Amino acid sequence: MKFIVKPHPEVFVKSDSVRKRFIRILESNLRSIIQRETKGVEVINRRDHIEVTGLSDEYRDVTLSVLTQTPGIHHVLEVKQSGFKDMHDIFEQCLEMNREVIEGKTFCVRVKRRGNHDFTSIELERYVGGGLNQSVESASVRLKNPEVTVKFEVANDKLNLIIARHKGLGGFPLGTQEDVLSLISGGFDSGVSSYLHIKRGSKVHYLFFNLGGPAHEIGVKQVSHFLWKKYGSSAKVKFISVDFDPVVAEILEKVDDGQMGVILKRMFMRAGGMVAEKFGIEGLVTGEALGQVSSQTLTNLRHIDNVTDSLILRPLINWDKEDIIDLAREIGTEDFAKTMPEYCGVISKKPTVKAVKEKLEKEEAKFDFSVLEQAVYNARVMDIRDIEKESQEQAPEVEMVSELGSDVVVLDIRSAEEEDEKPLELDGVEVTHIPFFKLATKFGDLDQSKEYLLYCERGVMSRLQALLLIENGYKNVKVYRP
């Protein structure tokens, strides 16, 4: 198993010292994750690229998943590496790998070469291409728009025959940009905006203003943990939860209805600024898009921004909702967002779309700011890696089962893609697939005389979903951990 990792082109327009630092950080990030997820896989910095090698293909899929989900990588070449004697030896190796691929098709040969050789890249392309054309009678050369492009690299004394090219995430290596604090609600927008800053190289910490109780917090923890685990697990980041119920109660009691939405957002930014300052974070990230709701007009956004000195970053400011949902689907947060409640939208019955500074200040003069300060002071800060541990501690009443009786039903709560990739088949036991995001609404329709065991790959989602069901009064739920 061998992969050649090509950093994003923007890395190479940096100065020499910055480029070297970025690639060292990318190397460190990859090594951190790969050593945790695999055994015997090496990560080697080759200055202008990174090589990832293993003695066998045992961890091929896991390694490729890490490489294509790590920020800072443009593409990944899956290669077969060997030595060579001369151009004819290279041709013979290319023929062995590509004979069946080019049969009955048009093709061309493209070579990248580094090092000192007695041939040029063009000479090698012509030699190998001519040899393939003569050796495979049904194939024909076409230099423009061929059906097959035979690609390989010659690096000094090594020949890299390209098996496949995999698209990377792009962006900058995680940790090359300054940290940001994402105001996450668990919906489509905040998940996508968090992802975009991870992709751009920032360690994203998560700040959650809890308006919906334990169930809402569990849901937001799930999506935050998912984003960190899939795209940023080389970084140590924080999940911070602030109970905003007292703040909302104060607004509802003392603030004019039309100003409530903007004032709530101003309170979010004030609290976010306090938390960011405490942890030395320069920027707040939100999922706001221009004109999407009443508080997101230019006038209202300006009034919202003015309450904090923190830089407010809005990567989705000009995005259409449809495009946001499409990206959420692509990165894997759509299923979380579908069932995530939006509590902020009910705050005003007749919200203003063009708030006036004097009116806002008049209404905020009625507000007891000690309530906000106390809420921030009582914020709960945790390492995002502890969410998995907490799910076990929060649900001690959730029984873990490893052996199955014939009278139980196993609910596979993984996504459809995960279930298709690794179907759960158990002899003599009924297995039903209900994705986790449908479980809350579908579970009540099941036969409640039966006992249900929830299953997912790592046991994190199944524990959290079991806790939610138990909180909703269901007692016939356990977790299956084979």
UniProtKB/Swiss-Prot annotation:
GO MF, one example: ATP binding
Active site: C456 (cysteine persulfide intermediate)
The organism of origin for this protein: Aliivibrio fischeri (strain MJ11)
Subcellular location, record wording: Cytoplasm
Annotated ATP binding sites: L183, I184, K265, G287, Q296
UniProt feature coiled coil, ranges: none
Disulfide feature: C344-C456
Keywords tagged on the record: ATP-binding, Cytoplasm, Disulfide bond, Nucleotide-binding, Redox-active center, RNA-binding, Thiamine biosynthesis, Transferase, tRNA-binding
Enzyme class: transferase
InterPro entries, per database record: Rhodanese-like_dom, Rhodanese-like_dom_sf, Rossmann-like_a/b/a_fold, ThiI_AANH, ThiI_fer, ThiI_N, THII_Thiazole_biosynth_dom, THUMP_dom
Protein name: tRNA sulfurtransferase
Entry's EC annotation: 2.8.1.4
